[in-house]
A protein has these predicted regions:
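Sec-dependent signal peptide recognition
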Residues: 2-10
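C-terminal motif of bacterial Sec signal peptides marking the signal peptidase cleavage site
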Residues: 15-17
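Bacterial signal peptide processing site
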Residues: 19-22
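Post-signal-peptide N-terminal segment of Sec-exported extracytoplasmic proteins
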Residues: 40-69
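Noncatalytic modules at the cell exterior or secretory-pathway interfaces
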Residues: 50-57, 116-132
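Short acidic/polar inter-strand loop motif in beta-rich domains
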Residues: 63-64, 107-109, 116-118, 130-141
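Exposed low-complexity, polar/acidic, P/S/T/G-rich flexible segments that act as propeptides
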Residues: 72-77, 133-154
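An anionic, turn-rich surface loop/hairpin at beta-sheet edges
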Residues: 87-117
Length: 154
């Protein structure tokens, strides 16, 4: 029993420490693992203090996702901020292997979209939309956004 309690305590400490690594992290699960072109994914983030932040686009797909890369648009509005930019997220490398972190048949890819961006304290709305020719992207589990202090400041 003491061993279980000790293990649980360690896990809780590690999990609570992870929360301090980012200012905001949001993932939206996609119904039927399909991301339709008109399905804009929206995230509401709060920045607790003005400063420099890195903004990442998060993309989780299932093994079998057929595209080498995916084109997405990130639109971010907040206090004195209006940002609208398209990005290409690499999915499959030149060696024909999936990029990112894989676990069995699930793959997580992240793209640094905004680096050392000064964000003011306050509420932000972030929209992600895919810009692929294909209307419905299959085998997409989740898309998301992470905002964190630049790695050099952590």
């Amino acid at each position: 029993m003491k061993k279980l309690l000790k293990s649980t305590t360690i896990c809780l400490l590690l999990l609570s420490a992870c929360d301090g690594l980012w200012e905001y992290r949001g993932l939206n699960e996609l119904a039927k693992m399909t991301w339709s072109k008109g399905d804009v994914q929206t995230f509401d983030a709060t920045i607790s203090e003005t400063g420099e932040y890195d903004v990442y686009i998060l993309f989780r797909h299932v093994h079998g996702f057929p595209y080498k890369d995916i084109n997405v648009n990130l639109n971010m509005t907040g206090p004195s901020t209006l940002y609208d930019q398209s990005y290409t997220i690499p999915i499959i490398g030149d060696d024909k292997e999936y990029l990112g972190e894989g676990s069995v048949d699930i793959w997580d890819v992240e793209l640094l979209a905004m680096e050392n961006e000064t964000l003011a304290e306050g509420a932000y709305t972030i929209n992600l939309q895919h810009e692929m020719v294909t209307e419905d992207l299959q085998l997409v589990m989740e898309v998301g956004v992470r905002i964190q202090k630049p790695k050099s400041e952590e």
